[in-house]
Design a protein with these regions (language model features):
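Acidic, low-complexity/disordered tracts enriched in E/D and polar residues
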Residues: 260-338, 361, 373
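Short, solvent-exposed secondary-structure boundary motifs
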Residues: 4-8, 140-142, 179, 289-304
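Short coil/turn segments at secondary-structure boundaries
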Residues: 57-59, 266, 348-349
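Active-site region of the double-stranded beta-helix
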Residues: 1-18, 30-178, 186-228, 235
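Long, charge-rich alpha-helical interaction segments
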Residues: 219-274
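Residue-level recognition of conserved beta-strand edge/terminus positions
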Residues: 181-183, 372
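Long, charge-rich, low-complexity alpha-helical segments
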Residues: 14, 19-21, 324-373
Length: 373
């Protein structure tokens, strides 16, 4: 089951009927949230690691607290460190009713990173993830709305949400197994109930029609000569208006000649080559390569890693998420097998044994494949 199915119950129905338009509530396996980010996971991050701001912020009674209230200084190899979270200060604030926010979890907590990476590929929009740890009976923020869509998933405890907007339930008790989708601008607030509450918010930093059209039109007007406006147009506006009409008509003609399918392909390629790197296990993979691959070595597609194949003359461009890899076009059939097969061995590729090993070694080094462990 893909990420969007897990969060919504039915990905296609969500895309067709809910996306960007209305609140949606899905009830799923109560263990889903804990498998992504448990209370023990958060305890580990806050009390056993050298986590620093801005990965953590703290809010109390609707206001974000100064970092100095929960951080300390330190040093590493003789160089100063700032913004280190002080777990003692942090717990004291939490005991007093403050909400602790873990920001950008997709960058440093693997289960969250995996979920977000899958969701990005399914939606075609960049995503981020924050977690909110709220003491019993506390409310971190007053009623507000976000400038992006969000999925909210309770992982521990319960929280009573006040949700307005199209399809909003008014009040919703969020507990493990409940996932809510709130479109941009949905007013909401939430209060923890009898126990400490932990929920994960996945924010969708949506790409918009305005964003796409602005980029395309910017490319068109980049060819317009950057010449002076006529002197004296303030006294005689006709000096400006007649030529402006001609230039606007020329720009409109250029816009009409834009190739929409080509622009769509360019948008997809930009997205599929501009994601953050995903190479967890790369050191272990290199150790496995040093020991040697065989025709029967089990290889897996790395989770959340795209592999879009784009023909380009005598080459193929492989869009790997964070970069573009070029390989000879004669490898098309083998590359298609890799792109469509979650688990394979070099012997599964339609190549001679040595060529199959060479290609697999390359794709392991590039991070698309990982050696089975």
């Amino acid at each position: 089951m893909n990420a969007l199915d897990r969060l919504t119950g039915d990905a296609q129905t969500f895309i067709d009927k809910v996306w960007a338009s209305s609140v949606h509530v899905h009830r799923t396996d109560p263990g889903l949230g804990e498998s992504v980010l448990s209370l023990a996971d958060v305890d580990h991050l806050l009390t056993e690691t050298a986590i620093r701001t801005p990965a953590v912020r703290v809010a109390h009674d609707g206001s974000v607290l100064a970092e100095s209230r929960f951080t300390r200084g330190g040093s590493l190899a003789g160089k100063p460190l700032t913004g280190l979270v002080d777990p003692v200060k942090l717990m004291q604030l939490h005991d007093a009713g403050a909400t602790i926010v873990l920001q950008g979890l997709q960058r440093y907590w693997t289960p969250v990173s995996d979920l977000v990476a899958e969701l990005e590929l399914e939606l075609g929009h960049p995503c981020q993830a924050n977690a909110y740890l709220t003491p019993p009976g506390a409310q971190g923020f007053a009623v507000h709305s976000d400038s992006h869509d969000v999925f909210v998933m309770q992982t521990h405890g319960t929280k009573l949400w006040e949700i307005h907007g199209e399809g909003g339930p008014g009040e919703l008790l969020l507990e493990p197994g409940v996932v809510a989708y709130l479109p941009t601008g949905t007013p909401h607030a939430a209060r923890a109930q009898q126990a400490v509450s932990l929920h994960l918010t996945i924010g969708i930093n949506q790409l918009t029609w305005r964003h796409l059209l602005s980029r395309l039109i910017d490319e068109v007007i980049a060819d317009v000569p950057d010449e002076h406006l006529p002197a004296g147009y303030l006294a005689d506006p006709d000096l400006l208006s007649a030529e402006l009409a001609e230039r606007l008509a020329a720009v409109a003609d250029d816009v009409r000649r834009l190739d929409a399918p080509a622009a769509t392909r360019a948008q997809a390629e930009q997205f599929l080559s501009g994601r953050p790197p995903r190479v967890a296990g790369a050191l272990l993979d290199r150790e496995a390569l040093a020991r040697g691959l065989s025709a029967d070595t089990v290889l897996r597609r790395r989770a959340g890693h795209p592999c879009e194949v784009v023909p380009d003359g005598e080459s193929l461009r492989l869009l790997l998420g964070d970069r573009v890899l070029r390989v000879p076009a004669r490898l098309r059939e083998a590359v298609d097998v890799v792109a469509s097969t979650p688990r394979l061995a070099p012997r599964d590729l339609p190549l001679d044994p040595e060529s199959a090993l060479v290609l697999c070694r390359r794709l392991v080094r590039e991070g698309l494949l990982e050696v089975g462990r």
